Amino acid sequence: MQRSSPQPDFSSPFTVGWDIGGAHLKIAVLDQNGKLIVVEQYPCALWKGLDQLTPLLKHLFNKWTPIAQHAVTMSGEMVDLFTDRIAGVQALLHTFAPLAGEVPVQVFCANHGFLSLNALEGHEAEIASANWLASAAWAAQQFEHGILLDIGSTTTDVLCFDSSSPIPIAIGDADRLISEELVYTGVTRTPLMALAQRITWRGATRGVMAELFATTADVYRVLGILPEDADQHDAADGGKKTRAASIARMARMIGLDGHEYDDAAWVDLAEVWQALQQAQIQAALHRVQQRLLTAPPAFDNDSSAYPLHSVFPSKQASASAPPSKKSRPIPLVIAGVGRFLARGLMHHGSAPTDFITVEFGVLGNLIHPDNQNPVLADYASRCAPAVAVAALLFRAQ
């Protein structure tokens, strides 16, 4: 998928942000003035091998030239292609670096900000799956305090920022799963069996088959709210991505066939699955909200805070600033292809009433006034980490 300005200027070098995931490769391109001109997302089944990534990188390096600098973040190091996450980080960077040639490559390294390729040894653990922190750092430059909610195809990130700096409870994936800042649920790739072992539908509580028969993409396709081009991987059965095929897959999860009930019944079932997923996200959002309301300021050297305001200066941040007052409503910066679930939480009263939602893609005036393309802003929100690392690197210069 690609969303770009009508006439990108290929005579001046670009800043390119990369988010190398386990299932998708996302890219954001800024022009010489730091304005966003393109956001692209490609399916990349990294668990199948690095040969899924290398040709794609070569294509994009040739497509977007000249390039002034690369900003790289990732989460793909966790796929089971690699023996461990450290090996994954090393393999991905060893794949990327030769293709970049002489163009500078800066890698996002958590609280260290950006590090060049020759300074990365020993920092692999901080590079691993730090893409969410880049998104939060960019959001924190726009608001003194708030919450980032990024609902993606596979996972959901929920974390707060205060005093213009992210203040995560945890950093690594294992700890983030405990803190609920990482919720392993998304709107296309999550197997329905991961949402519940039993569900209540049509007056009966019934078991759910522990089989990869259907995913959340089927639920939102049945409900008619799955964004265009959101589902870039094969369906659970390798079949068609039609509404009828999704109904059949969803029915199979509870031992039924799609022809056994009418359309309204299947919509009801899809809404059951949606409610279960929203409840998971809502619980995490509530917990992180309480963290924000009770958190000390990030500059107080709280052991769980990452003082990124010192790495990426912001007009709001100051090492001597007083603790921020949590004004209401709280900015809720929404990102990811599943932003429609966040809006659903707001509209259906299942979320606290003291939030105001802000689309990630409009932050920082990255889109030129002459290019106010809502589709570009949409894709900037979908691919938040790629946009964030590009913007952070450009503005740090």
Explain the meaning of each model-derived region.
Residues 1-22, 28-149, 159-315, 323-397:
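Nucleotide/phosphate-binding catalytic cleft detector across ATP-hydrolyzing
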